[in-house]
């Protein structure tokens, strides 16, 4: 996510995902993903039933395993910052050698367009401020190959209690949905080239979604992108639902990457990284 300076950062109905997701008022039902509600319901049940299965390194049926559990084959990033520790992808910064900007571990298996991505993460702040921020880039682009810098859609998460689950566009339009929001992103008719974000519904209260996120422990994240509709889900709870109709900016495809955020010392870990295409 964007450079944040802890601790004073800007602050931004319970949603049972195993039930049918109802279309909020003014939802663009002509979206390529208008049939997603039924799929989300099925996904929620799958997450609840197979949670223990996702702890294994074996990919669920129909998914590709992006991490072999032993080394960073198929990934590229700064080797001083990224390694494999105890079978997990590990990114770590230190107080003695802080990084000056956000950097990323990039999946080299190609680009993704319409997909479901599942991964399990843990983030631990190694500092007095309790600061730690990371995320998963998707449909993104490499902005600086030499420094492993990426821009694009980001499924955000952090060690604090505000940003986990939001949709942020790294090196782009910024926050496209705060946690709990259903948003419609479109051009601002009053300011050509600018972005207008309309909140058209809710998937739940931010604090209730946060209560389902485990502190300094493993959490399951699911990202679904289909057409111009984007969903984030943590531990079976939908956190945002975004339809991006600013087509001059909305990415249809791009790379995947994990973020290591600049700032105080922190450790972020990933495992069980599974991908499947949606058609």
Model-derived segments and their meaning:
Residues 9-10:
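Short, low-complexity intrinsically disordered segments enriched in A/P/G/S/L with frequent Arg
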Residues 56-279:
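Carbohydrate-interacting regions of secretory-pathway proteins
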Residues 3-5, 26, 34:
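Low-complexity, intrinsically disordered or signal/transmembrane-proximal segments
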Residues 32-38:
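Positively charged n-region of N-terminal signal peptides that target proteins for export
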Residues 41-52:
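Bacterial N-terminal signal peptides
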Residues 13-32:
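Short, Lys/Arg-enriched N-terminal segments with co-localized hydrophobic residues
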């Amino acid at each position: 996510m964007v450079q944040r300076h802890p601790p004073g950062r800007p602050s931004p109905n319970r949603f049972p995902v195993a039930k049918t997701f109802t279309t909020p008022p003014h939802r663009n039902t002509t979206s390529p993903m208008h049939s997603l509600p039924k799929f989300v319901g099925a996904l929620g049940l799958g997450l609840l039933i197979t949670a223990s299965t996702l702890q294994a390194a074996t990919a669920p049926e129909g998914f590709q395993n992006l991490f072999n559990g032993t080394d960073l084959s198929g990934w590229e990033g700064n080797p001083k910052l990224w390694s494999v520790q105890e079978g997990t992808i590990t990114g770590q910064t230190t107080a003695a050698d802080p990084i000056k900007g956000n950097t990323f571990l990039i999946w080299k298996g190609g680009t993704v367009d319409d997909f479901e991505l599942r991964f399990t993460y843990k983030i631990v702040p190694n500092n007095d401020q309790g600061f730690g921020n990371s995320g998963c880039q998707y449909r993104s682009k490499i902005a600086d190959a030499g420094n492993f810098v990426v821009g694009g859609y980001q499924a955000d998460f952090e060690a604090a209690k505000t940003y986990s689950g939001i949709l942020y566009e790294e090196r782009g339009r910024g926050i496209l949905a705060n946690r709990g929001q259903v948003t419609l992103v479109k051009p601002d008719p009053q300011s050509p080239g600018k972005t207008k974000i309309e909140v058209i519904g809710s998937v739940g209260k931010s604090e209730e979604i946060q209560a389902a996120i485990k502190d300094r422990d493993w959490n399951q994240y699911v990202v679904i992108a289909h057409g111009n509709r984007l969903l984030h889900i943590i531990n079976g709870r939908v956190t945002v639902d975004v339809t991006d109709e600013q087509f001059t900016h909305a990415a249809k495809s791009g790379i995947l990457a994990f973020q290591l955020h600049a700032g105080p010392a922190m450790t972020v870990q990933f495992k069980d990284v599974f991908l499947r295409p949606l058609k």
